[in-house]
Regions:
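Leloir-type glycosyltransferase catalytic cores
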Residues: 1, 139-184
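Generic beta-strand/beta-sheet core signal
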Residues: 16-18, 57-61, 90-92, 110-112, ...
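Short, well-ordered coil/turn elements that cap or connect secondary structure elements
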Residues: 49-51, 82-84, 121
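Nucleotide-activated donor-binding/catalytic signature segment of Leloir-type glycosyltransferases, i.e.
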Residues: 73-92
Length: 184
């Protein structure tokens, strides 16, 4: 069965990628020009400015033929960071359960992935630099510029962002409305 990772993931920062082909992710960049820049600059800042381990989790749907992408995030990270011991890439096909992983990490960073809603509903702080449909609803920390984004990353990695019960309730409501009621 799929596991939840290992001790390197305890207290780590999880960068949860959305599906590259997801139309919900198009045109929402506010801080970065594209996904590759967002991923690389987020990892770079976390490694340089925090002591946290960093996990980059490719969207699990990309393991399926219908959801596959030509984007090679593992190669992108190796090209920029080599064999950095604090960086762990989890490919779509890797046998790690994203929800078990959520239980271990201290902070979740998303662009548009639904796991941002789920993480907040579970009480995990979420930081996003995008205009995703849920980032303005009050249960994630949204950044509109690079300095604000980097400050939120540092605060989240240091455990300074706390999800309140009303934030969790709003995330549950958002999940229900967008993931349960919106399917036909």
């Amino acid at each position: 069965g799929a596991g939840g990772g290992d001790a390197r993931h305890d207290g780590a920062v999880l960068i949860a990628l959305n599906s590259s082909w997801d139309a919900a992710a198009l045109g929402l960049h506010t801080v970065f020009q594209n996904n590759a820049e967002w991923i690389v600059e987020t990892v770079r800042h976390l490694l340089a400015s925090t002591a946290a381990n960093v996990i980059v989790r490719q969207h699990p749907a990309e393991r399926l033929p219908i959801g596959a992408t030509t984007d090679d995030y593992g190669a992108l990270l190796r090209r920029h960071f080599g064999d950095e011991p604090r960086l762990h890439f989890i490919a779509a096909a890797d046998s790690i359960n994203s929800y078990a992983l959520l239980a271990r990490v201290a902070l979740v960073v998303t662009y548009t992935s639904t796991i941002g809603i789920e993480a907040a509903a579970l009480g995990k702080p979420v930081v996003s630099p995008s205009n995703a449909y849920y980032t303005g609803l009050g249960f994630v920390w949204k950044a509109d510029d690079l300095a604000g984004y980097q400050a939120l990353l540092e605060a989240g990695a240091a455990g300074q962002l706390q999800v309140t019960p009303p934030m969790r309730e709003d995330a549950h409501l958002c999940y229900y409305l967008t993931q349960c009621c919106n399917w036909f």
